[in-house]
């Protein structure tokens, strides 16, 4: 009898992992759908728009120094459905008065009867944002996140528009990865850039069905910024910084106090590029960390280097750009690299006085953060 009971318990445990549970969350207009599952003990999600698959079943989960929470997991609770309806002002983007409407649901994943983390999903008409909320384990009130299983599986036939990330400590003054590499256009899936993944945001085309934009938002000092790593079979996963960045100082594995939260991972879906271009999800799901001490006024400016490069760094050309800014009604000029040697400190002060007479301010490039000991550190006008 004991053997029969034991067999039954094992069968139920295996069956639960094999078949799993799933839950669907729709955007307000009912077109965008996220399906969250724990089939096979593996947390996952998929994304459909108007019934068409834009992300196939994609992995979720994290691995920490407290354990591997990417497998043998169970979806033990689906929170009550709620909604967000917010309007805010942001004067530095094309849509200065975004209105954000989304449906919200929290999915609790457990292991061996213990709650490990919630995954909070917010789904609007074209945007998905999700993050992990990690629970303390007994008296352990902190952890190190070794890696995220968080992934995005693109359908077969998808193509990519991605910016490969450079290896660390190379390029100009050893500043790479400086996120200035060229995008590849309409390339096949299954690559990993130059071997180091890709820089957000990452754009994909789902054949003739539409577009997918993958990115992140809400990154603070409590976690690290991430990149996207290309794998096989259309899978792309979250990757932490490269070991050699910042001369190898520090760790690439974020540590966090518990309970703690990760940044938001975002997915924007559209039949056309319009929802991709118009999305404000990177602002919609975050709140200001603090109130500004004053109301800052933003303005337009000019920059010679983007057109003329290093050769444009001379007194006469910078004066011409000051005149150009004044004629256009712009408020500033960015004076880029080499101004200290090609214009000089005395002449740059003269330029600053001339600019002030025209109602134009100068921003002078400072290279304190990179390997340029001959460059000035603190000079501004």
PLM region spans:
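Active-site beta-loop-alpha junctions enriched in small/polar residues
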Residues: 305-307, 338-340, 365-367
């Amino acid at each position: 009898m004991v053997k029969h009971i034991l067999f039954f318990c094992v069968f139920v445990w295996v069956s639960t992992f094999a078949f799993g549970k799933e839950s669907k969350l729709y955007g307000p207009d009912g077109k965008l759908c996220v399906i969250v599952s724990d089939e096979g003990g593996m947390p996952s999600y998929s994304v459909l728009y108007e019934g068409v698959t834009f992300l196939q079943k994609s992995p979720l989960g994290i691995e920490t120094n407290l354990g591997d929470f990417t497998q043998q997991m169970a979806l033990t609770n689906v929170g009550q459905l709620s909604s967000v309806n917010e309007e805010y002002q942001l004067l530095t983007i094309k849509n200065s008065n975004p209105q954000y409407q989304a449906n919200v649901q929290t999915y609790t994943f457990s292991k061996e009867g213990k709650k490990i983390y919630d995954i909070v999903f917010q789904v609007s008409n074209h945007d998905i944002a999700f993050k992990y909320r990690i629970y303390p384990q007994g008296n352990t009130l902190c952890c190190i996140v070794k890696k995220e299983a968080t992934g995005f599986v693109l359908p077969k036939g998808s193509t990519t528009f991605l910016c490969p990330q450079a290896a660390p400590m190379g390029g100009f003054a050893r500043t790479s990865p400086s996120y200035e590499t060229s995008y590849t256009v309409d390339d096949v899936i299954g690559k990993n850039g130059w071997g180091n993944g890709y820089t957000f945001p990452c754009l994909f085309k789902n054949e003739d069905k539409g577009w997918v934009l993958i990115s992140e938002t809400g990154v603070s000092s409590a976690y690290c910024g991430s990149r996207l790593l290309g794998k096989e079979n259309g899978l792309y996963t979250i990757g932490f910084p490269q070991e050699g960045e910042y001369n190898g100082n520090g760790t690439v594995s974020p540590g966090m106090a518990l309970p703690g939260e990760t940044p938001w991972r975002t997915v924007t879906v559209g039949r056309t590029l319009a929802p991709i271009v118009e999305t404000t999800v990177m602002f919609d799901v975050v709140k200001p960390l603090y109130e500004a001490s004053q109301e800052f006024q933003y303005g337009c400016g000019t920059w010679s280097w983007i057109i003329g490069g290093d050769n444009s760094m001379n007194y006469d050309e910078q004066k011409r750009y000051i005149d150009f800014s004044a004629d256009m009604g712009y408020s500033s000029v960015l004076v880029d690299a080499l101004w200290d040697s090609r214009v000089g400190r005395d002449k740059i002060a003269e330029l600053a006085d001339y600019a002030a007479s025209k109602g134009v301010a100068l921003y002078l490039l400072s290279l304190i953060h990179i390997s340029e000991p001959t460059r000035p550190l603190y000079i501004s006008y």
